[in-house]
Amino acid sequence: MFHHVCHLWTASRWDGTPGLWLQQRAFDRPLYPGGYDLSSTGHIDPGETPEAAVLREAREEIGLDLSPDSLVSGGSYRQRYPRGESGGFDDELAFAFLTRLDGIPAFSPGSEVVGMAFVPLDVFAAAYEGAAPLMGRRADGSRLTIPHENLCCLHDAEWKGVRSALQTLLAPESTK
């Protein structure tokens, strides 16, 4: 049985570079402590729509108060992946959403998130082709190297589904 979750892909152009914002999970999280994940993720509560859930998770996890019209649907994906050290598997139906916030968004991470990291889109894409570390920047501009094994957001079907939408969203002439 699949449980329903939402994923927010926060796209940005920072100093002209197209990329994605990833959250670093808090070190006390039961799954993937200290790992890097999509900017906001979480379970969809009973009776809650996927869109309402992703807006709630963005507020709770990274302090962004987004409007529904700032979201682009990225589709839904069935995913199964190991639960890390706790064992077993997660079986999810993930509803993906994309948003574009240029520059450095006004993140205010909650207790589940340590901080935010910007990774160029081509660097993130390369993570699917090999195990090289990802070079990025923290919101304060300092350089950051994310070991490949610290990524917990690599879901092939979802990436294949949202990649072209991200490229369109990040095109220089796009404003959404």
Locations of the language-model features?
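Nudix hydrolase/Nudix homology domain
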Residues: 34, 40, 75-84, 88-176
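A generic structural motif
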Residues: 11-13, 100
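A short coil-to-beta-strand element that immediately follows conserved catalytic motifs
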Residues: 65-75
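Alpha-helix capping at helix-to-loop junctions
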Residues: 59-67, 102-103
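Short, amphipathic alpha-helical segments
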Residues: 48, 52, 71, 87-91
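Conserved Nudix-box catalytic region and its N-terminal flanking loop in Nudix hydrolases
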Residues: 1-9, 16-56, 60, 131
